[in-house]
């Protein structure tokens, strides 16, 4: 949820913080403000696996929750563009950790027959976070008159305080995440792989009873016995891994290049170029978020029936058609 919220909140705040920091006519600084979180996200994703393998899943989830609180409070409180980007970097680091570790934790703690469904629900919470952020931004911002100048927006409540409350609003779900993270059990699979057999057995018993606990623990121990070497980045250089690695990397890259990030984060430019005012932009972003949630739920219901590949092809073709029409609409 917080991954989606923090990723998109900046899109609604963008028309206002750019005026406050005086970067409305500086594309380089605009790009830096938008991409600074992605740099933090890169380092968070790279470090999440190593940190969670060494310290456990639960402590790193608590760390991510604390960082989300830090970025929510700090980003809204700053008066310096440099500090704004520092806190966005911190938020990006939290996103990187959460986006990597949350699906892993869910897969490790969920019963086998519910594992796929729970991981799908994780994706649903991401898009719900996106939609919540869009609705909150829309409700916080005061109406902006058509034809309002940069100076008028900068001196307005939106330009001075509105964008800050958009970031501060994230403190509520971040604080809930932080508190409930202490209640979460540690991953029983991590406990078992770390030699804490009794602790793992206790968690599995809480989840599915004694028989389930014994069966799951035996399966983990059997898998560990068959493992001849530890996994690591060096194994990715094995020629036998090239095909799988290529598919995984290319799919991930193309997914990020599909264009939805532009729609969410640069909605201001896209909709204003189509003739909408700032207030209309914030409302239209909510419409995109609702559509996102609807089709995510639809995909959850049909993915097992249609298959992953079919849904990927349908989605890719749909995006290509939609973006073609969107691009053409600016000329007709």
Language-model features, listed with the residues they occupy:
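Loop segments that connect adjacent transmembrane helices in multi-pass transporters
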Residues: 214, 221-222
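Alpha-helical transmembrane bundle of multi-pass membrane proteins
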Residues: 1-205, 222-332
């Amino acid at each position: 949820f917080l991954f989606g919220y923090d990723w998109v909140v900046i899109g609604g705040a963008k028309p206002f913080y750019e005026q406050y920091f005086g970067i409305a006519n500086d594309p380089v600084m605009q790009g830096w403000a938008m991409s600074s979180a992605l740099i933090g996200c890169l380092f968070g994703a790279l470090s999440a696996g190593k940190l969670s393998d060494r310290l456990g899943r639960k402590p790193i989830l608590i760390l991510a929750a604390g960082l989300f609180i830090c970025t929510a409070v700090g980003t809204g409180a700053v008066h310096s563009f440099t500090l704004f980007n520092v806190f966005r970097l911190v938020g990006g680091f939290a996103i990187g950790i959460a986006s990597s570790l949350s699906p892993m934790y869910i897969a490790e703690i969920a019963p086998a027959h519910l594992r796929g469904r729970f991981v799908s629900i994780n994706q649903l919470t991401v898009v719900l976070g996106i939609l919540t952020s869009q609705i909150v931004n829309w409700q916080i911002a005061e109406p902006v008159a058509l034809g309002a100048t940069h100076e008028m927006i900068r001196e307005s409540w939106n330009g001075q305080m509105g964008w800050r409350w958009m970031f501060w609003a994230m403190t509520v779900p971040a604080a809930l995440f932080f508190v409930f993270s202490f209640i979460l059990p540690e991953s029983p699979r991590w406990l078992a792989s770390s030699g804490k057999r009794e602790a793992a057995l206790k968690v599995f018993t809480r989840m599915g009873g004694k028989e389930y606990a014994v069966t799951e623990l035996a399966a983990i121990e059997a898998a560990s016995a068959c493992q001849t070497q530890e996994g690591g980045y060096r194994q990715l250089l094995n020629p036998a891994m090239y095909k799988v690695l290529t598919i995984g990397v290319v799919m991930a890259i193309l997914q990020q290049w599909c264009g939805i990030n532009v729609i969410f984060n640069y909605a201001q430019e896209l909709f204003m170029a189509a003739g909408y005012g700032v207030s209309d932009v914030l409302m239209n972003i909510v419409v995109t978020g609702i559509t996102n949630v609807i089709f995510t739920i639809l995909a959850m219901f049909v993915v097992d029936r249609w298959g992953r590949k079919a849904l990927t092809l349908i989605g890719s073709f749909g995006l290509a058609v939609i973006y073609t029409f969107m691009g053409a609409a600016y000329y007709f």
